[in-house]
């Protein structure tokens, strides 16, 4: 079928409340460039995909794409898992960027505690995903195993530096994840000697 039909079908599946949709992007496909990968992540985030997985193309023995690799301009490793090394449309360095981008997705978008904040950040600010990617790379964090708490602190620090208008949402995400109120993301939360008013307007949640 047509690509537009497939996208509409995916969008519909993502809209179903009783179904969690995992969408896969494959770096190294012919005609697929790095900038298009970034664009597709934003598209899938706008559909509210439950998870966005980014993997590298593998040319398995006996497959049609492997037989046509030279014709398609694909270079791949002769050793398992036979990953694509470069194509006419994406360089070896860009494939490494895509691998690191997949780490960002797993650390933040695919982690329930930080997913909604990450989604809102990258959708409301078209350059945010690039900024977050560079921030994690420059601080040598993107390829490190990090705890849920550490990832939350990093995201809060990123918002504080680059998108301060999201600090309240970052603090709320931190609290909802059950993190400590003594850590930096809860620095603006007042807990001592606080008396609730007799009446208040509920701005968030159900009470």
Q: Residue locations for each model-derived region?
A:
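Conserved non-cysteine loop/helix-boundary elements of the Radical SAM core domain that shape
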Residues: 1-79, 85-88
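Generic alpha-helical secondary structure signal
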Residues: 4, 8, 35, 93-96, ...
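Aromatic-residue detector
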Residues: 25, 55, 77-83, 99, ...
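General N-terminal targeting signals
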Residues: 38-40, 66-71, 76, 101, ...
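C-terminal accessory region of radical SAM enzymes
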Residues: 80-116
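Radical SAM enzyme core and accessory elements
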Residues: 102-207
């Amino acid at each position: 079928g047509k690509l537009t039909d497939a996208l509409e079908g995916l969008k519909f599946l993502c809209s179903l409340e009783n179904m969690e949709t995992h969408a896969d992007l494959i770096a190294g496909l012919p005609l697929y460039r790095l900038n298009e990968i970034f664009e597709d992540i934003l598209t899938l985030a706008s559909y509210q995909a439950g998870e966005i997985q980014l993997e590298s193309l593998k040319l398995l023995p006996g497959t049609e794409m492997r037989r046509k690799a030279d014709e398609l301009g694909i270079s791949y490793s002769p050793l398992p898992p036979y990953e694509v090394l470069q194509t006419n449309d994406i360089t070896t360095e860009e494939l490494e960027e895509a691998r690191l981008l997949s780490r960002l997705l797993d650390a933040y978008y695919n982690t329930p505690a930080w997913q909604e904040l990450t989604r809102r950040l990258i959708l409301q600010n078209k350059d945010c995903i690039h900024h977050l990617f560079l921030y994690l790379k420059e601080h040598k964090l993107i390829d490190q195993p990090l705890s849920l708490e550490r990832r939350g602190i990093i995201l809060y620090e990123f918002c504080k530096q680059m998108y301060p208008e999201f600090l309240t949402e970052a603090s709320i995400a931190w609290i909802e994840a059950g993190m400590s109120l003594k850590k930096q993301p809860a620095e603006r939360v007042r807990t001592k000697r606080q008396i609730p008013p007799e009446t208040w307007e509920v701005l968030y949640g159900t009470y």
